[in-house]
Amino acid sequence: MAALAGLGVLGAGRHLWKLPVRLSAGLQGCGPRRGYIAGSAERSPTFGLLFDIDGVLVRGHRVIPAALEAFSKLVNSQGQLRVPVVFVTNAGNILQHNKAQELSDLLRCKVDPDQVILSHSPMKLFLQYHSKQMLVSGQGPLVENARALGFQNVVTIDELRLAFPELDMVDLQRRPKTMRLRSDFPAIEGVLLLGEPVRWETNLQLIMDVLLSNGHPGTGLATAPYPHLPVLASNMDLLWMAEAKMPRFGHGTFLLCLETIYRKITGNELKYEGLMGKPSILTYQYAEDVIRQQAERRGWAAPIRKLYAIGDNPMSDVYGANLFHQYLQMANRGEEEQQTGGQQKQRPSATQSCASILVCTGIYSSQDPGSQVPPPGRRELPFHGHRDFSFSPGLLEASHIVHDVNEAVQLVFHQEGWA
């Protein structure tokens, strides 16, 4: 797809791993498919699976048929998962338990809330900001999500707009008829960017007002403070795939707008105290912990040695999995602990590798030559990753490329001797 021309030449020196696709007619649930022998596979697994959601399991609100077939292989006769599984999504505009219920309904398989890792889930680790007055941007259940992450004092963009009605002036229809300014509004001490908002012009304007005024948008400052207030952001996806034939703008596009405006106005770079969501190492460390805890609860004694990350977006899923694999290799060699999004965390020693598996049912398409060649007049492909992640073409090469998630699960079972 031409819109993804910036994702590097994928699959160079790699193979498109194929297995015969076996469709299950009239699949009624998430039980093992007919004829599938699971007896030998009921041993303690030494691997875990990280599933992206959009473009891998679903397109919009429609389940991809291959996902039903894949999950029929992943459960035993009692309907329990045979291996540890987490769902790692860059979405963040839904509550964790609601996303788990949505997946349960679509996949016809029980998904627990703690198996769902939203883009902002690692914000639970940023304890130093949980008691501060934070402005939150995004959509959906913003306050509920922020409080679930541990933030005790949050202010929404709409609340700020009502307190300072003179700040939001783009939409003539929404301009207030009267100006009742509040003098008792608490100072903002930081900004949470949980996902793309609905009214970008309003959010961009008010976030800038807060940053330029050091949290006092009703007064303003002669000189913008720098460093500015702490900013935590999640979901760096420039694009994402829904029902439309072409990708849609993601939160990464909103972040790009905010960064560009801030630099143009102040001459300085917008800084983040934490960037999370794929491809951040912090998100994969968080997922690794959830996988390990899941295995412990199930009584699986064997340590989890390998992770398989299955996704459709080369820049977030493949880049992130390969970056985490690189981190694991460095840690296993005893090299210095890596900095991860403003936090440092001691990595459990068991996990040794993370393999990236790219599917062709979402952002990436092996059938579209435009997604793998530079546009006319360019030698290189444009980089669709976030500004704070350097462009490393090697990290965009998937360990394996398969057609869909069913083939991905077949590949993993083959690799692990579970087929």
UniProtKB/Swiss-Prot annotation:
Pfam families: Hydrolase_6
Cleaved signal peptide residues: 1-15
Superkingdom field: Eukaryota
Keyword annotations of the record: Signal
Alphabetized SUPFAM superfamilies for the sequence: HAD-like
Cellular component terms per the entry's GO annotation: mitochondrion
CDD domains reported in the protein's UniProt record: HAD_like
Entry annotated with the keyword Cell inner membrane: no
Disulphide bonds in the chain: none
Record-linked PANTHER family: CDP-DIACYLGLYCEROL--GLYCEROL-3-PHOSPHATE 3-PHOSPHATIDYLTRANSFERASE-RELATED, HALOACID DEHALOGENASE-LIKE HYDROLASE DOMAIN-CONTAINING 5
NCBIfam families per the UniProt record, alphabetical: CECR5, HAD-SF-IIA
Homology family: Belongs to the HAD-like hydrolase superfamily.
Name of this chain's protein: Haloacid dehalogenase-like hydrolase domain-containing 5
Gene source species: Mus musculus
